[in-house]
Structure formats: C-alpha cells, structure tokens
Amino acid sequence: MKTKKMILVDKVFYEKILSVESFKENIITQSAIPKISNKEVRLISSGSKIFYAINNTSPHSHVQLRLNRFFLSHIPLNSAAKAFVRGGSYLKYLEPHIYGSSYCRLDISSFFNNISFDDVKQSLSPYIKDEYLIGTEQKLIDAILNSVGYESPIRKDKGMIIPMGFRTSPAISNIVFRKMDLLIQDFCAKKGVIYSRYADDMLFSNPRESKLLMSDYFIDEISSLLSIMGFNINQSKYISREKEISINGYVIENKGGNGSIGTIRLSKSKLNTVLKVTHALAQNIPYKNICNKYIKVRLKEKNIKYESKKDEFEKKYYRDQLINYLGGYRSYLISLVKFHSEYKCVNSDFIIQINGILNDIQNHIQKIKKNRRL
C-alpha cells in the first residue's frame, strides 16, 4: 500500500499557498499576522448554542478556505472519525455496528468549547516547520493559529478557542481528537467492541451477548479516557440498548445477535413529515396549508414587495417551497438506496418502502410543476 507523504508547511508555502494576497502587506512590512478581531465575527444564537461566523471580507476567512483545502484535509485522521472527512457520512458512522448485539451511544459535552488551544497547537505543530514567518517576532505556527482561533468576548475565561461555526473548526476537531480516538479504539479492541464517532457522538457495539456496554465500568473507562484531554460525557444523552437502537432518526436492529448481520432503517418519526406531506398533496390540500402545517414554512408579510401581486407571489412561493422540500427529501432517500447498493446494510423491507415513497414524491413534483393553481 502506498504511504501518504507527510505534509510540512513552511514559510514559502504559507506566503504562496495559504496567505497569497490576504496578508501581503504584513509580509512585506514584516508586521505580525493579527488575531481575528471582534469586528470580523458575528455571534449567532441557536437555542443554547452560540455559533461564530467570520465575515467573508476578513483576510482570515480566505486563509481558512485555503487551510482546509491545502493543509488540514491532508493530515491523517483515525478511522473511527466519520464526520467532516472526505467520503464520511452519518450512515458510515452507523454501518460498522450492524453486527452488534448491544449498543451504547455517548455524547461528548460541549465538544468544540472544550477543545484546548494548547492541544490544537500540539496537534498541528508536527506539520508546520518550526521557523519564523515575520523576522524574529512571530513563529509560523502562531500566524496560522491566529487565523483559526478566536478570543470570544463571551468566553474570556477560555482565552483562544476553536469556535463552532468557523470553517476550519470541524477539521481541527478531528485532528485534535485523533489521539483520543486511538486510545478509545485500543481500549474497545481489547474488549471486542466496535467504536465510531460522528463529531461529538460516540457509538459502541458489541457483537457478543454481553452486558459490558450497559455497565458502569464501561462508562467510567470511557469517561476516564476523555478526561485526559478535558472532555466530559453528557449524561443526559446516554443511550444503551440490546438488539435495537434508535439514534437521530436512524434505527440499527439485529434481532439475531451473536455476530449475525443486522440492518439500518429510518425511524417512523423520521418519515412522518414527508408521508404527511405526500398524503396531503394526494388529498389536494392547498400548498399554503401544507407548508404552514407540516414543513413549518410561512411567508412573512415584509417579504411581499408588491401588494397588487400578493396572491401571485404567495402561490409561487409555496409552490417553490414544496418542490424544494420534496426534491431535497428525494435526494436524501436516493442516497440511502445508493448506500445500500454498496454496503447491503439497509433493511430490505424498508428499501421497498423507500422506492414507493420516491415514486410518490416524483409524481407530486411533476404535478406541482404543471399545476399553477392552489
């Protein structure tokens, strides 16, 4: 097998590939690459979570794009990581566990917020040449870190953080967590347990008939390993089951156990909305009512520019919303069928159901496109 060549970023690589025009003046005048300022970042609240969006006009934003493309994506990761990786997906996170007799899902509490910036520096330093970028004032690694970290005004006690919402944060989280993935994977291998991770979600399965994954011992061991890097388990999201487990709308079931092959399917709740939408369309319920009631889409009055054309605008809006919703769900279901064709792990009865839903969706899309009346 061909070994992937280790990447090493040096001053020339930074200037010609990563920075380009972004900090050209700093390079010429030999002034340090600055940290990301508060005026370059917008804070977005979503429930109890805070996301950070860097302005597209920020030079750091352009550096982040190139860091992802030319640097971070070339750093090797642990095989357990299934999110934020090329070819990764939620289904690939679930698929290794179809042989399980018992299951355990653990959630890492405040995943991004608890990534230590010291661990970020330690994890990236082997791939960045130990040299100065600006005279003897700023090391190359510090210049790069200034483009991926942020001193949040609402988390001053943390210093520099890897903000949830920065385009480089997902890749960096996998790189930093690689050490932890390896420790957990090694522990699980000794116990005959399968492990995979999707961002902050960790899934474990045991092919053998055993109560290990439901024991305090197992949870304590994983907790102990996570604590090495300052991570904790979110106890409220702990799930352990035998024969079948439902996670985020997906169900893994293996009634046979003892290493037999199980299957994956979508839960009834995951399909509930699209089935209600297609049923409502079959009953010729107005598009506006369907959008308002089932997909929770409602046209705001302020978005209607011309009162005289309100009815026409509203009809087109809800028609387009339905087409977009059905088209998106159609693509999603097709991805399940394609995944099954490669991995043979989706429940066969469910594949039949999917094909029926796909046929209904396609017929409704065609009808909506032809129909110009509500």
UniProtKB/Swiss-Prot annotation:
Keywords attached to this entry: Antiviral defense, Magnesium, Metal-binding, Nucleotidyltransferase, RNA-binding, RNA-directed DNA polymerase, Transferase
EC number: 2.7.7.49
EC main group: transferase
Any one Gene Ontology molecular-function term assigned to this protein's record: metal ion binding
Binding site for Mg(2+): 107, 200-201
Boundaries of every Reverse transcriptase domain copy: 25-252
Membership in a protein family: Belongs to the bacterial reverse transcriptase family.
Name the record gives this protein: Retron Eco8 reverse transcriptase
